């Protein structure tokens, strides 16, 4: 749709008599020609009426040795001596070197005609659009996708498309060549990376990429969605109204949610969220609606001066919890701008040039502060008055009548809203420049199109206005354009015509017109025209009948009807709308398609131009004439610096607090008072709290007064609350459970079908097709999305069709994404009653041996209760998963007296192993030429030694092989968009300023080198340069007269700091101007003259104050490290100072001589790497043996417990190898550096940051872009009969090859051929948690929790709470500054936001700030930032953590404290609640667990036991065995006892075939010990059920439950006593009867 197909070229011909020798010949082509695309060119003869044949050629450039295209056309008077042939350049005929621009020569030859134009070539021959079945997936699931391919005229492209899948790290894991409209699944790996993946598609011979995105997360679908709607688009600072946010919560099947919302407002300032604690409110959600209000007084209490908030944004954080508490959805409305004016004005699609004396059409775009279009807003232009009102898309068109005698025009437009004072209206100004006529002729053409909303089918009025020499204009007889003529009468300066808008003009086109004067002047104008975004064709999806459009039952049959263009291929998909609650960013739409197409427009302005040639250039055209009138040669497919295009796209207590605070008139003191009356989570006294106040003595006094005042009041009130769940065992009137068929099919998307509309079209040319489908069993709303494709009308995305599915009574079983084996968890089933009457319900949990629950094999767990009409009720089921894997959990429910109403749900629950997941990575360099024997490199990868593995859990090993080099991995692994934190304003003393200046310098250097500014925003570069110059100017304050530096000018000068200033300033000169070379060279002179010793070493006499800024230089071998560091600074400044510092070369030689003497004797890997870089940079080292010998694994230079130093040292080593041209050694090093995901910082990380990014940037520059690659790799895995064979060559170098195995065994890899590759072996397993293995460095840490009772006010819907107390002390000599606490919450718990806010907001603040990472699929994490941690006393924090769902047998949570300035200083401790009552009983032997019954053996409750009763019980059908046993010993384990018994006699044999072979274990709960009262060396009669047998590896164990019969069998001597004679006889008879005769039938 772009290129010449977008242009209507109208020629206004002035007829002058004359022969061809005075004729003017014109050639117009697109400014950029696309390969494999039909492009239209125009050739015209003016002043020549002689018919002729023209030959059109397209040649290669510059040699013109190859004809890429040729065509012959006839030019004659019948065609007005104007021809518009099409040309097409085959992609395979032109060079594919994407590193340089490619051009072609368009040539026209004929009698008296020879025209040539060199035109830029583009490989973008079409568009590829990718549709996925949804935008978010879970690991291991299939991604369904379709590929649509079309050219620029929206016609089908018959070209092969290459489709790649890329991980979030940018690694290509799949690459396929596919054909037209292809659809297939890609299966995500279970070990795949979480995050945003890409599908990248491109034509086989084109570098242009088209990308679709999808997210991979561990998630479960919500049951409802929440929408927030602010009362205004912005917060008007001068208003008096409060700010309201409407909350709407709807279940996905359309019904309203009943529940509660917790709302917190805040202000986002410079990216940091500042919450307003007093705004936290609890809002009832009734009938799905609620409203939250931010009062201006509440905002002012947090920010007294509201004017300081202008330019920042409000946000509202809302969490909605259902009435049953079963589900929770959190959302946020952000971007509510705080403004003085509620509007912003932009000049969009407005020409930069005007014609004096002619109308000038000005298009303005008015937005709300959030960027959305502002409709019905009056606007007015000043100076030249014109008024208008914005349309629904926010645009307004103003027509200005320009004066004749001006060359520039200052245009100011403002809003003219009646409710706003003038000073609050939005204003915007621009300057337009006069169009320059050719040779000052005064001839003008203005094309006027006044319509603003244009759609297909309209007749567009077009006016041609001409002004100039009257004699010339009178000779214009007609206007000619491509589809006909428009007559013009003599003296007529305005000619009008109508242009029919056809679908092929969507989404926009350019109308270019020109006329010629004589044989050398062209007068031209153009206008850009936007057309409403609709399909070129037709596609509608709907229900086939009225019945089909109604609400459906789950699994019901229905019909949908498709209507569209005959022959169209229609791709369908149905998506659960819950998916869009989580992510709706990547859904395909018609607007996104047109946006993509419009971005390929080679035009650069909204129309017009600086002069006649500028009109063509700005419209994306190239022109040449026979009189050498030529547009400029275009050298870029993109426009120069284009402007952003915006598409339309408690009362008494409160009274007491308030009255006390009101006693303070000063606002600051009032805040001190108010903060003191907030609850302190740690329980600190008022006096201790006051120690944390930094605002002065007056604030402390006010704080203490109010704190003591409120203390007595706070002690008076206590609240308690409880919960009672009734239970009813009545079973009458319910249908049989076996008659309830459970719902089991709950896909997130389905209906992935492609159909063709083959029916005969109706009178409107529309074909239809009716499809019968069976709905899936989810209670939700399905959104059916249809995308059609036709060869002539391209792609069309229909409006989604919604299908609602629900029942009057149903179960919503809320199952988490995964649970941990042995970890007790609560599963909730929510029962909904949408019937018009109350119902009595029975609900039951079905038994599954994979879980321990209240349901057993003998008896299911049931509850019965009443659910009121139009309400719901949650039923909790507590389970303990016992087996890893996917297991069914099923709940069924029926309604008493209503046989047709029931429901059942069966879902899969994923049970994962306990422990913590660990990864072990091994990297092997495959280089058969260097490492092979006889051309083959063989590697044996040994099995992992995993002593800490959780028993009976799987080990997964993933082998990834990728060809080197890995430059593309750098650019993706080190994401430029994550470097924003480095662009900061320098400040502080001479040392601190350099720390902060380093950040923007290295960020700019890296982003410049890797060309990644686009990821951060190109405007950020100007900001970074500004910060660099700010740092430079501030550092001049600390420059001494001798050009040396210190933290303060009154301190002694530092060798290291001066060298560092030289290094950073020298680096900055590559990016910014204005840094004095004399400043740099002055520092160099000082270093040489004052700090270099005779032996060449540099000496440090005045160490810096901030030792951490020096990185790894401190420590052993410091003289060598200081010398090497200083030498590096001298070398990096050499190009600047070589001419002005005479002694520079000799100084460098002395330093290198010194280092060479020390190099081979160095002990520290860090020192070795730094010295190697210094020597290599000076061209004094080319042998890497010493350097590589100091490495660990040949990919890193490590020292114990010093991660940031290791990053720094490894970066030095990489630089050294690059200087030595040892490129083959660099791949694994680069991979290790990028795998660290280290994005740097300032304090404590300065040197690691600067060296990492300097090294990676240098790698990008120096690494050869390609090398010969032809590798054969064979992997022999233990479980595979046939080896895996991979071939790596230049065609597939970027594709990562992967293999997986679950066997932890040795395997072999062999490689042969040319080139290198990197093999990464990643082993993932679950390791046992071992707190004692945690090493604490520089911190002492204690963590504890205790149960607390919640009053009603604090409950917030929680089921319980713990108080988490964290105490820490820094073990250094001074306080630790800027410390971070990373807390992993217990499963089911969330932090109390009020407690955390109080800790961070008051004047006695204990924490600087906090963040909560609440990923529903994982445990919640809390990050707390502390300004300091004392080294002399314990610092304690305490806050509540609230239990939102029941969890037992939980794994410990963790607390990690570490220094922001030095990540190696850290300590981790674990915590967990007391395992008390309320937990289900389980018994584990080794790693195998069984559910234990809730009651003990009930034998003691039998009133009378005799022989017949024993025979009856022992012969019950479910009794498996009867034994006489002897108790050998009792072993106590965690929570249970093991009774080890010998089976003396098998009275009734059972499943255990040989129980007398070895002693058998009988296992019982600890609480049954007293009831059982079993004694060692006593004999027992015992029998039990088959379900109580527990098969182990080579024997059976037996569970003692309430169904186990145990009686003491007296010894032989006791049987002589009268007391035991009858009992002994009964036992003997029982044994004889069952042994000889067996059980009676």
UniProtKB/Swiss-Prot annotation:
Region of interest: C3d-like domain: 981-1259
Lineage: superkingdom: Eukaryota
Keyword vocabulary terms for this entry: Cleavage on pair of basic residues, Complement system impairing toxin, Disulfide bond, Glycoprotein, Magnesium, Metal-binding, Secreted, Signal, Thioester bond, Toxin
GO CC, one annotated term: extracellular space
UniProt tissue specificity: Expressed by the venom gland.
Compartment(s) where it occurs, according to its Swiss-Prot or TrEMBL record: Secreted
Residues annotated as signal peptide: 1-22
Record-listed cross-link Isoglutamyl cysteine thioester (Cys-Gln), residues: 989-992
Descriptive protein name: Ophiophagus venom factor
Native source species: Ophiophagus hannah
Lineage: Eukaryota, Metazoa, Chordata, Craniata, Vertebrata
């Amino acid at each position: 749709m772009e290129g010449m197909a977008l242009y209507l070229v109208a020629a206004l011909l002035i007829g002058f008599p004359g022969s061809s020798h005075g004729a003017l010949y014109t050639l117009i082509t697109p400014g950029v020609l696309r390969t494999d695309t039909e492009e239209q060119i125009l050739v015209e003869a003016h002043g020549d009426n002689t018919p002729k044949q023209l030959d059109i050629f397209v040649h290669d450039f510059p040699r013109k040795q190859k004809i890429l295209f040729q065509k012959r056309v006839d030019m004659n008077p019948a065609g007005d001596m104007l021809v518009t042939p099409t040309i097409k350049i085959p992609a395979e005929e032109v060079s594919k070197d994407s590193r340089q621009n490619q051009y072609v020569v368009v040539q026209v030859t004929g009698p008296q005609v020879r025209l040539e134009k060199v035109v830029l070539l583009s490989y973008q021959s079409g568009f590829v659009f990718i549709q996925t079945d949804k935008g978010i997936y879970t690991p291991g699931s299939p991604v369904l996708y379709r590929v649509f391919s079309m050219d620029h005229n929206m016609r089908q492209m018959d070209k092969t498309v290459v489709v790649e899948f890329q991980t979030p790290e940018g690694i290509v894991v799949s690459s396929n060549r596919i054909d037209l409209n292809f659809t297939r699944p890609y299966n995500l790996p279970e070990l795949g990376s979480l995050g945003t993946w890409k599908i990248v598609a491109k034509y086989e011979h084109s570098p242009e990429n088209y990308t679709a995105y999808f997210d991979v997360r561990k998630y479960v679908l919500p049951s409802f969605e929440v929408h927030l709607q602010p009362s205004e688009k912005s917060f008007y600072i001068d208003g008096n109204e409060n700010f309201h946010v409407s909350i709407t919560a709807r279940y996905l099947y359309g019904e309203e949610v009943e529940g509660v919302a917790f709302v917190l407002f805040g202000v986002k300032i410079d990216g940091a969220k500042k919450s307003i604690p007093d705004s936290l409110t609890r809002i009832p959600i009734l009938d799905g609606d609620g409203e939250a209000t931010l009062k201006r007084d509440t905002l002012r209490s947090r920010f007294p001066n509201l004017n300081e908030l202008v330019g920042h944004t409000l946000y509202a954080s809302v969490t909605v919890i259902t009435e049953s508490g079963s589900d929770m959805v959190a959302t946020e409305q952000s971007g509510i701008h705080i403004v003085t004016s509620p509007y912003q004005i932009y000049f969009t699609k407005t020409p930069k040039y005007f014609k004096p004396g002619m109308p000038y059409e000005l298009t303005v775009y008015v937005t709300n502060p959030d960027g959305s279009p502002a409709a019905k807003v009056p606007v007015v232009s000043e100076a030249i008055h014109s008024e208008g009102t914005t349309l629904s898309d926010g645009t307004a068109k103003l027509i200005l009548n320009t004066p004749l005698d001006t060359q520039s025009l200052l245009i100011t437009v403002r809003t003219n809203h009646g409710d706003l004072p003038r000073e609050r209206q939005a204003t915007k100004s621009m300057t337009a420049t006069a169009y320059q006529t050719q040779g000052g002729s005064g001839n003008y053409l203005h094309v006027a199109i006044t319509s603003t909303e244009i759609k297909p089918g309209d007749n567009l009025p077009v006016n041609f206005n001409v002004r100039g020499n009257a004699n010339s204009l009178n000779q214009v007889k007609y206007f000619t354009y491509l589809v006909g003529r428009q007559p013009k009468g003599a003296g007529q300066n305005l000619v009008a015509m109508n242009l029919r808008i056809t679908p092929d003009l969507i989404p926009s086109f350019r109308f270019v017109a020109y006329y010629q004067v004589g044989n050398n002047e062209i007068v031209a104008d153009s206008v850009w025209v936007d057309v409403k975004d609709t399909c070129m064709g037709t596609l509608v999806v709907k229900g086939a009948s009225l019945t089909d459009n109604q609400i459906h039952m789950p699994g019901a049959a229905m019909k949908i009807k498709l209507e569209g263009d005959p022959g169209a291929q229609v791709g369908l998909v149905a998506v659960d709308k819950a998916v869009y609650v989580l992510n709706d960013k990547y859904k395909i739409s018609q607007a996104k398609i047109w946006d993509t197409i419009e971005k390929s427009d080679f035009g650069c302005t909204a129309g017009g131009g600086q002069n006649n040639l500028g009109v063509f250039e700005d419209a994306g055209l190239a022109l040449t004439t026979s009189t050498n009138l030529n547009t400029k040669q275009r050298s870029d497919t993109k426009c120069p610096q284009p402007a952003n295009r915006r598409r339309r796209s408690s009362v008494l207590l409160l009274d007491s607090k308030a009255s006390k605070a009101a006693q303070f008139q000063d606002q600051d003191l009032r805040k001190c008072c108010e903060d003191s009356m907030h609850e302190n989570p740690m329980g600190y006294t008022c006096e201790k709290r006051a120690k944390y106040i930094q605002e002065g003595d007056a604030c402390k006094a006010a704080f203490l007064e109010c704190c003591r005042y409120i203390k007595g009041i706070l002690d008076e009130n206590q609240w308690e609350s409880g919960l009672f769940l009734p239970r009813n065992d009545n079973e009458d009137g319910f249908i049989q459970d076996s008659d309830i068929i459970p719902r089991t099919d709950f896909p997130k998307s389905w209906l992935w079908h492609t159909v063709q509309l083959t029916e005969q079209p109706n009178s409107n040319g529309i074909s239809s097709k009716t499809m019968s489908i069976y709905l899936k069993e989810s209670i939700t709303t399905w959104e059916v999305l249809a995308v059609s494709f036709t060869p002539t009308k391209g792609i069309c995305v229909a409006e989604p069709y919604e299908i609602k599915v629900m029942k009057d009574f149903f179960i919503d079983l809320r199952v988490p994404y995964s649970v941990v084996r042995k970890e007790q968890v609560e599963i909730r089933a929510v029962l909904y009653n949408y019937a018009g009457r109350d119902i009595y319900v029975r609900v039951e949990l079905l038994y599954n041996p994979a879980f321990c629950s209240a349901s057993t094999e003998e008896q299911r767990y049931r509850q019965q209760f009443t659910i009121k009409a139009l309400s719901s009720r949650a039923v909790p089921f507590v389970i303990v998963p016992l087996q890893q894997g996917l297991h069914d959990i099923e709940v069924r429910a029926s309604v008493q007296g209503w046989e047709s109403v029931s429901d059942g749900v069966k879902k899969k629950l994923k049970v994962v192993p306990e422990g913590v997941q660990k990864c072990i990575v091994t990297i092997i360099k495959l280089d058969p030429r260097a490492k092979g024997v006889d051309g083959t490199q063989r590697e044996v990868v040994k099995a992992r030694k995993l002593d800490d593995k959780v028993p009976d859990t799987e080990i997964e090993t993933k082998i990834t092989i990728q060809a080197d080099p890995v430059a593309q991995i750098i650019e993706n692994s080190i994401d430029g968009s994550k470097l924003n934190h480095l662009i900061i304003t320098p400040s502080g003393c001479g040392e601190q300023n350099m720390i902060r200046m380093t950040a923007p310098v290295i960020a700019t250097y890296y982003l410049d080198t890797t060309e990644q500014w686009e990821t951060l925003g190109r405007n950020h570069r100007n900001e970074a340069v500004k910060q660099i110059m700010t740092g430079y100017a501030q550092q001049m304050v600390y420059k001494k007269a001798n050009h040396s530096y210190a933290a303060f000018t009154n301190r002694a000068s530092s060798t290291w700091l001066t060298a560092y200033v030289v290094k950073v300033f020298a680096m900055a000169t590559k990016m910014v101007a204005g840094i004095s070379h004399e400043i740099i060279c002055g520092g160099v002179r000082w270093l040489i003259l004052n700090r270099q010793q005779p032996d060449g070493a540099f000496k440090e006499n005045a160490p810096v104050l901030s030792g951490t800024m020096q990185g790894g230089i401190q420590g052993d071998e410091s003289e060598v490290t200081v010398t090497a560091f200083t030498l590096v600074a001298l070398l990096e400044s050499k190009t600047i100072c070589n001419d002005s510092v005479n002694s520079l070369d000799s100084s460098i030689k002395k330093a290198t001589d010194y280092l060479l003497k020390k190099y081979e004797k160095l002990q520290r890997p860090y020192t070795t790497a730094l010295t190697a870089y210094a020597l290599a940079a000076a061209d004094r080292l080319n042998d890497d043996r010493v350097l590589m010998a100091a490495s660990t694994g040949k990919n890193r230079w490590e020292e114990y417990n010093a991660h940031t130093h290791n990053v720094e040292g490894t970066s030095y080593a990489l630089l050294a190898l690059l200087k030595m041209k040892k490129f083959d050694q660099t791949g694994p090093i680069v991979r290790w550096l990028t795998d660290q995901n280290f994005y740097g910082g300032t304090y404590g990380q300065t040197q690691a940051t600067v060296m990492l990014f300097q090294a990676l940037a240098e790698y990008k520059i120096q690494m050869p872009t390609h090398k010969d690659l032809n590798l054969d790799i064979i992997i022999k895995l233990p479980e595979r009969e046939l080896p895996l064979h991979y071939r790596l060559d230049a065609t597939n170098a970027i594709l990562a090859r992967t293999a997986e195995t679950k066997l932890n065994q040795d395997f072999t890899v062999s490689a042969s051929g040319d080139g290198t590759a990197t093999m990464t072996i990643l082993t993932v397993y679950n390791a046992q948690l071992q707190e004692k293995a945690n090493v604490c460095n520089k911190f002492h840490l204690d963590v504890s929790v205790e149960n607390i009772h919640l009053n009603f006010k604090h409950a917030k819907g929680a089921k319980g709470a713990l108080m988490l107390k964290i105490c820490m002390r820094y073990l250094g000599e001074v306080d630790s500054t800027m410390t971070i606490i990373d807390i992993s919450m217990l499963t089911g718990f969330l932090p109390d936001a009020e407690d955390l806010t109080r800790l961070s907001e008051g004047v006695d603040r204990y924490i600087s700030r906090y963040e909560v990472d609440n990923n529903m699929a994982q445990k919640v994490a809390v990050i707390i930032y502390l300004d300091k941690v004392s080294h002399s006393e314990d610092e304690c924090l305490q806050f509540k953590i609230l239990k939102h769902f029941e969890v037992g047998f939980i794994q410990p949570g963790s607390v990690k404290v570490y220094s922001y300035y030095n990540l190696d200083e850290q300590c981790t401790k674990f915590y967990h609640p007391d395992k008390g009552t309320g937990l289900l009983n389980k018994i584990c032997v080794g790693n195998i667990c069984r559910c234990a019954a809730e009651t003990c053996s009930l034998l003691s409750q039998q009133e009378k036991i005799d022989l017949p009763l024993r025979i009856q019980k022992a012969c019950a059908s479910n009794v498996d065995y009867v034994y006489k046993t002897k108790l050998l010993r009792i072993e106590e384990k965690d929570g249970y006892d093991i009774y080890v018994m010998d089976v003396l006699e098998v009275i009734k044999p059972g499943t255990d075939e040989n129980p007398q072979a070895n002693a058998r274990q009988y296992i019982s709960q600890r609480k049954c010990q007293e009831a059982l009262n079993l004694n060692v060396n006593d004999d027992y009669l015992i029998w039990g059920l088959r379900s109580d047998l527990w098969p182990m590896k080579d024997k059976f164990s037996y569970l003692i439950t309430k169904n186990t019969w145990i009686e003491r069998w007296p010894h032989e001597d006791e049987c002589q006593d009268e007391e035991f004679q009858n009992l002994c006889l009964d036992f003997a008879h029982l044994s004889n009867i069952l042994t000889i005769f067996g059980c009676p039938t």
